């Protein structure tokens, strides 16, 4: 395996057209480069990069697990500081299940991390579980007296039952409103036969207003939060959980509260719908992000057999249905093959980007670029798990029905192994988590001073 020592190594991306006009090729500088930040093998299975707003310049890398395929292993958060991975992990989480898509899969720093030292992690826990598969667990941690090491013990905020080791979602971010957003997959069974993605609670399926099961046959375990993005106030606890707080026991304390603007927040109006839900209709919103400039949400939702999609939610909106398992991309979903056209119904919102399978297979949601490379600013960058191609949406126009995009190269033309996620630095620089090589990369260009070259 190729390794890198002492210096960063850069690979120029080979620019190729996917589906876009010639004029749109100008969205990226001609010398756009991926610069390797640390040597190959620095991480076991990197899945994302985060940066606290504390002025330290450090990067925190989510290392999903040590032993992929193990039902009881460890995962960690590691720090890149001054261009090197610190020998001691920031946090090591024991008893992590890492089969399929499981592991340590989400990290979010509190907006006030610089003063309160609090952060949140999502992982799949081995051992006792509520549902058929390992629970998804949201835990609150704090930093120790050593800024590079966290306290090992945290407080569980929420446990969510699951039915399989895939479609775990698991991404978490604080929105511009200060609330925590958490993405959930639909449980992993092909086609979502239980209707989890369209079920908002005990009373109905939003899609067709008929009674919903929302649990596997005969199990008695409910999976109301699967196929959703939920929104929580993790700064305020609840003394006595309301009946519609689906991840808590009614009447018992909870480590979170419900933001009043959530679509089903009112227990009087929605006694049987889950107050935690922010939006729904997802298959596996594996990676999502907020535009740091205006708070808009960009969601990569992994498709079933035929299409991948990027969803968009304006900052001012709530309660949107992104239509899985009614639709896959712009098409009506069917286990026998999708058909053209999917009419939005029951508040349904179509995606902004759709692309077909072959050789692509699973979208990896990215970020709207707000970093130092001026030509990239305002462009949405994302990837695909099967090809590791880097895609850039050509100046997303939120009011447009669809967005165009280009590809900046695909394996073997880029140095990327397997793209698993992205992350922003505090300065807006964009990073790529490369599971294939156990490293991370940064988008760079000679057209900015930060990379050591004077621009024209």
Regions found by a protein language model. Give the residues of each.
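A short helix->beta-strand "capping" segment at the edge of beta-propeller domains
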Residues: 27-42, 150-154, 348-354
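Loop/turn-rich, solvent-exposed surfaces of beta-rich toroidal or solenoidal domains
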Residues: 329-402
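Conserved blade-ending motifs and adjacent loop-strand segments that build the rim/top face
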Residues: 401-425
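Bacterial N-terminal signal peptides that target proteins for export
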Residues: 2-12
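Signature of short aromatic-glycine-proline-rich micro-motifs recurring in repeat-based ectodomains
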Residues: 42-48, 99-109, 164-175, 274-289, ...
């Amino acid at each position: 395996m190729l390794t890198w020592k002492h210096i960063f190594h850069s690979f120029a991306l080979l620019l190729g057209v996917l589906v876009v006009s010639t004029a749109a090729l100008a969205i990226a500088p001609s010398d756009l480069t991926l610069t390797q930040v640390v040597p190959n093998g620095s991480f076991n299975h990197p899945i994302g990069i985060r940066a606290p707003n504390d002025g330290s310049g450090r990067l925190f890398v989510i290392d999903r697990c040590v032993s992929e395929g193990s039902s009881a292993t460890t995962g960690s958060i590691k720090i890149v500081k001054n261009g090197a991975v610190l020998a001691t992990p920031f946090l090591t989480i024991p008893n992590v299940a890492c089969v399929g898509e499981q592991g340590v899969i989400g990290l979010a720093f509190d907006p006030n991390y610089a003063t309160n030292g609090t952060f949140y992690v999502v992982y799949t826990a081995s051992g006792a579980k509520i549902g058929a598969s390992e629970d998804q667990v949201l835990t609150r941690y704090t930093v120790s007296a050593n800024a590079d090491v966290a306290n090992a013990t945290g407080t569980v905020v929420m446990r969510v039952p699951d039915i399989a080791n895939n479609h775990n979602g698991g991404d978490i971010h604080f929105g511009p409103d200060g609330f925590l957003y958490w993405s959930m997959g639909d449980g992993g069974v092909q086609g979502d036969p239980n209707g989890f993605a369209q079920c908002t609670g005990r009373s109905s399926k939003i899609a067709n207003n008929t009674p919903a099961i929302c649990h596997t046959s005969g199990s008695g375990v409910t999976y109301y939060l699967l196929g959703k993005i939920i929104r929580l106030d993790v700064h305020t606890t609840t003394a006595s959980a309301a009946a519609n707080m689906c991840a808590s026991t009614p009447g018992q304390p909870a480590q979170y509260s419900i933001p009043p603007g959530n679509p089903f927040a009112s227990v009087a109006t929605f006694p049987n719908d889950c107050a935690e839900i922010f939006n729904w209709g997802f298959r596996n919103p594996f990676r999502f992000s907020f535009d740091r400039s205006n708070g808009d949400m960009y969601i990569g939702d992994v498709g079933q057999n035929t299409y991948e999609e990027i969803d968009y939610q304006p900052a001012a909106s709530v309660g949107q249905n992104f239509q899985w398992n009614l639709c896959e991309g712009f098409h009506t979903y069917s286990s026998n093959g999708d058909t053209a056209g999917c009419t939005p119904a029951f508040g349904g919102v179509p995606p902004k980007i759709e692309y077909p399978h072959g050789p692509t297979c699973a979208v990896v949601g990215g970020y709207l670029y707000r970093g130092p490379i001026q030509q990239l600013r305002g462009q949405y960058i994302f990837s695909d798990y099967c090809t590791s191609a880097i895609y850039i949406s050509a100046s997303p126009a939120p009011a447009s029905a669809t967005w165009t995009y280009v590809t900046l190269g695909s394996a073997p033309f880029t140095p990327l192994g397997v793209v698993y996620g992205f992350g922003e630095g505090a300065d807006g620089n964009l990073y790529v988590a490369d599971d294939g090589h156990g490293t991370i990369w940064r988008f760079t260009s000679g057209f900015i001073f930060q990379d050591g070259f004077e621009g024209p």
